[in-house]
UniProtKB/Swiss-Prot annotation:
Domain ABC transporter residues, every copy: 3-244, 299-533
Annotated organism of origin: Vibrio vulnificus (strain CMCP6)
Cited function: Probably part of an ABC transporter complex. Responsible for energy coupling to the transport system.
SMART domains, sorted: AAA
Family membership: Belongs to the ABC transporter superfamily.
Name of the protein described by the UniProt record: Putative ABC transporter ATP-binding protein VV2_1533
GO cellular component terms, semicolon-separated: ATP-binding cassette (ABC) transporter complex
């Protein structure tokens, strides 16, 4: 089933300029392609045109043509799109319609008046394809992120559509679950021959399995339509602010030139013997002296235990502390209890046992409002934090609550919007933003209040590399120059590797590690226990037979940090 965009453009009703411009793209039946690009580049808008949300649910001006299997879609009713294109949304919770997994999978069949006997066998067979056959009676809302993704996938597979569209399927998944998701998509592609379109920021994770082509978008246009090897051998990823695989960054740092014939899209196929000497020389430049200094304790978590239902503990006897001025990560799989820690610190829920101290004061003595003046929390889902229609008003909300005059509010909001890369959107309505842009708005709202302790829950979910690097470099600067203590709750291994110094690892509701980040990242058994995975940087070090894996990883981190500092200085001078 061929998909073809011809001179296709689209402009949202609320915007003056088109979001998509002159798109010319042909996707052949059975291809698997990945669409990448910075936040706001038009990736998700292109997907919404493909699945019919534009123009049926989202209004705007369309020009050019989109054909599916040779049929012009301009005259399609919504059901004609859904009969051919199945979509797994980034926010899976918004996609569920049934009280149980079985009901949710059966929804499309019920609409088609399928008989109960046939429906039962189809639901069972589809659930088996995605490893859910033993869970049909459970509520989809009680599942982990990866399980929810599989329910959504089953809901479209049962309809036997020819085109599968995935809108950032990895955004909310831990590394091991994300890896399994890519494997499931690949297995389905190989077994069914369906056309697969994946919109995703996490390029290295998607390339865990073969893809035919990568479409690079920026500012509403297609900038490249090429193979993975051709893209990774080119300078395009850096040019458009897309994060390249870590192993490539390390090889390039050592001065290694990667040619197309080297198959740079696959670490297992790279001729590493050609780079052994250069990598050894690069590593020998490492300065292994540690400059980490412990200071006084800011956050002290003691024997924390909590259960949502009174039966199974979400946290069990967890203790750790965070020193003033540290940049720490809390790692763990979906459902391990990471976000529960945030809720307990905020005061949204109270522990069944244990206590939390900030600056030596028991947080149970403070109201939620009093805690919010000391601790800034940026939640995982931006839609759970946003309360205003316009971006400027959202960022200004906390400052106005403090009684600031409008001139002070205006100056501070503009400063923070600039730092977070949002200044050009300050007069936009929030609903016109992408998920990643909404995330930056919530972070800007918290940063405007200058908290003593900043907690970010999955800050990179839905963010492109350029925007999250800009934002976190700013947070890193606050941490370095102003001493703001930062805790990142994440399962983004790249983020943790690049920015944090110590990792607290939670698995099955318990603390399983509290150690320097490089110690954690070079322990495959520990990572597997927490549903995490080793990074390609670790795999590169082991394939190069580096005796000191930890030191190799630390040298890479130091080089990257120095590069970020240099770029910051250059921007300030400019």
């Amino acid at each position: 089933m061929t998909i073809e965009f011809s001179n296709f453009s689209f402009r949202y009703e609320s915007l003056d300029k088109p979001t998509l411009r002159n798109i010319n793209l042909r996707i052949e039946k059975g291809e698997k392609i990945v669409i990448i690009g910075p936040s706001g580049s038009g990736k998700s808008t292109l997907g919404q045109c493909l699945n019919g949300l534009i123009p049926h649910a989202i209004k705007g001006e369309v020009s050019g043509s989109l054909t599916i299997n040779g049929q012009e879609t301009a005259t399609f009713a919504m059901h004609q799109f859904t009969e051919q294109v199945g979509t797994v949304l980034q926010d899976t919770d918004s996609q569920f319609v049934g009280l149980s997994i079985g009901e949710d999978i059966a929804f499309a069949l019920e609409n088609q008046l399928t008989s109960n006997i046939e429906m039962y066998s189809l639901v069972k067979a589809t659930a088996k394809m995605v490893d859910l056959e033993q869970m049909l009676q459970r509520s989809p809302h009680d599942l982990s992120g990866g399980q929810k993704q599989r329910v959504s996938l089953a809901g479209i597979l049962v309809d036997d559509v020819d085109i599968l569209l995935f809108d950032e399927p990895l955004a909310a998944l831990d590394p091991k679950t994300g890896k399994r998701t890519i494997e499931i998509i690949d297995e389905l592609h190989r077994k069914t021959g369906k056309t697969v379109v994946i919109i995703e920021h996490r390029l290295e994770d998607v390339l865990h399995r073969h893809v035919d082509r990568i479409i690079l978008m920026d500012d509403g246009e297609i900038m490249a339509d090429t193979t993975p090897d051709e893209l990774l051998a080119s300078p395009l990823l850096a040019q458009y602010g897309i994060r390249e695989p870590l192993y490539l960054t390390a090889l390039k740092s050592a001065g290694c030139h990667l040619a197309l014939d080297d198959h740079p899209s696959s670490l297992s196929e790279l001729p590493l013997a050609n780079y052994q000497h250069a990598m050894a020389d690069w590593f020998h430049q490492a300065n292994t002296t540690s400059n980490h200094i412990r200071s006084e304790t800011l956050l002290d978590v003691r024997n924390l235990t909590y259960s949502y239902d009174g039966e199974k503990n979400a946290l069990e006897g967890v203790s750790f502390n965070v020193q003033r001025g540290e940049f720490v990560s809390i790692l763990g799989k979906n459902g391990s209890g990471k976000s529960t820690i945030t809720k307990l610190i905020m005061g949204v829920i109270e522990p069944d046992d244990g206590a939390i101290y900030l600056n030596g004061q028991d947080l149970s003595e403070l109201t939620i409002f009093e805690r919010s003046q000391k601790v800034g929390v940026v939640m995982q889902n931006p839609n759970h934090m946003i309360s205003h229609h316009m971006i400027f008003d959202e960022v200004a909300f906390g400052l106005r609550n403090r009684g600031w005059d409008e001139q002070q509010v205006n100056d501070k909001v503009l400063e923070v919007l600039e730092l977070c890369g949002l200044s050009k959107y300050r007069h936009w309505p929030i609903e016109a933003l992408s998920y990643g842009q909404k995330k930056r708005v919530t972070i800007a709202s918290i940063l405007a209040l200058e908290p003593e302790l900043l907690i970010l829950d999955e800050p990179t979910a839905g963010q492109d590399y350029r925007n999250y690097t800009s934002m976190l470099s700013f947070i890193e600067k606050l941490n370095r120059e102003l001493g703001i203590t930062v805790v990142i709750i994440s399962h983004d291994m790249h983020l943790v590797l690049e920015y944090t110094t110590r990792s607290i690892v939670i698995a099955d509701s318990q603390l399983v590690a509290d150690a320097p980040m490089t110690d954690v990242f070079s322990n495959p058994a520990l990572l597997d226990q927490a549903n995490l995975t080793t990074t390609s940087l670790y795999e590169l070090a082991t394939r190069l037979n580096m005796a000191e894996t930890n030191a190799f990883m630390q040298h890479f981190i130091d080089v990257e940090k120095a590069s970020r500092l240099e770029k910051t200085v250059e921007r300030n001078v400019a």
